Amino acid sequence: MKGTKTEANLWAAFAGESQARNKYTFYASKAKKEGYEQIAAIFQETADQEKEHAKLWFKQVHGIGGTAENLVDAAAGENYEWTDMYPTMAKEAREEGFVEIAALFEAVSRVEKVHEDRYKKLLENVQNGMVFSRNEECVWQCRNCGHLHVGKMAPEMCPVCAHPKAYFQIKPENYGLIEKAPRGALFLFSLYR
C-alpha cells in the first residue's frame, strides 16, 4: 500500500476525522457553557463517533501496536514536534511578523519535550518491569477509588473497589510545591480551598 493514493487517502481521512473530533469537542464545551446541554451532548456524541472513524483509518494505515511500541512511536512524534516542527513554525511566524504566535509555538515546543521525556520514562518502566513495582516501599494509589497501599508492589487487586492492579499508580504528591509558589499563586490557591 506504501506510496499509493489509497494510503494518502487513509492518512487524509484520519487527519480529517481527528480534526473534526477535536473541533466538535470544542463546540460541545462552548454549547455547554452557553446553556445548551442537548446541543453539547450531540456535539460530544458526534465527536466520539468521529474518533471511531479516525481509529478505523489509523488502524488501516499505521496500526496500533503494544504499549511499549506505542510509547516508542509517541516519543518519536513528540521529538519531531519539539526539535523540528515547532521551531520551524516559530521561525516562519517570526519572519512574517507574528511574534506572539512564534512565542506560542516555542512554548508548546517546550511542552512537547516534556511529553517525549515522560513517554521515554514510561517505556523504561515497562521494559524494566517497574510499572507496578519499585525497589523500595512507596505509596500506591488506586486510580478508581483512591485506596492507598504501602509496599514495594501494587496489590493484585484493590481491596476496596476490586479493580485490578492495572488501576494503581504511585501516589502523586506534587501539590506540596504550592508552598514554594510565588505569592500571588499561593493567594489564588487559597481562594479555591
Regions found by a protein language model. Give the residues of each.
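Non-heme di-metal
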Residues: 1-178
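Positively charged N-terminal leader segments that act as targeting/secretion signals
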Residues: 178-192
